[in-house]
Amino acid sequence: MPGEELMGNRRKVIVVEGTPRTSKKQFARLLARELNYHFVGEPVPDSGILKSFYRGGDRYTLATELYFLVSRFKQLGQAMEQDLFSPSDTVLSFMIEKSRIYASMTLSDEEQKIYDSIYPMLSTTGVKPDLIVYLYAEPSIILRAVRNSPITGEEFMTREYLDSLIEAYHSFFYRYTACPVVFFDVSEIPGWNGENQDVAKDMIRFIDRLKPGSNFYVPRLAAP
């Protein structure tokens, strides 16, 4: 496959993560197709859960965060189980650690203690990324996407919440040392929807030249 030929330093597990409305799933699926990798998408949440979460109902916060944690744990567990019988290189559109990012922003101190007592049992999935591609965008662009095409529950997302979430994501990935992290500001791509094949091919070339730690990707695309 063309993508495989480009990526000489083969990485078995690639994770595409990021802030809301950055087309993580679409770009992860495209990278998987270009590399001839297996694709594992994040589980689709229940719309009622999302609505309760973004409305800010405190009584649902802990239950919501545990729901997401368990859902992601199950999805990764199923992916690992399949890989035991037919090992394959994989691109995932999420990582279990994102659960803790969200929880740290929304839970009270007492709820955080309960969450922290459960998290270690559900965060050891055996999935160890060889590379993380972190997608992010300007808050105004994310909120515009929410207004133009709202997903149930997201209409209750505030600018203050989004600013804090992006800051938490940035902080987490700047400090991440288990594998290289590629920072990609998708605001740089007009009309970004995660399905730009030229960007995917250019990203694969960039991945081939990564250094340890944080790497900052700026697409180098041919003029139309």
Task: Describe the residue ranges of each PLM region.
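NTP-dependent small-molecule kinase module
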Residues: 147-156, 160-224
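P-loop (Walker A) phosphate-binding loop of NTP-binding proteins
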Residues: 19
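Hydrophobic positions on the alpha1 helix immediately C-terminal to the Walker A/P-loop
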Residues: 27, 31
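Conserved glycine(s) of the Walker
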Residues: 23
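Glycine-rich phosphate-binding loop used to anchor ATP phosphates in small-molecule kinases
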Residues: 60, 64-127
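Conserved substrate/cofactor phosphate-moiety recognition/catalytic segment
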Residues: 33-71
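Hydrophobic anchor at the beta1->P-loop junction of P-loop NTPases
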Residues: 16
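A glycine- and Lys/Arg-enriched "phosphate-lid" helix/loop adjacent to the NTP-binding pocket
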Residues: 99-167
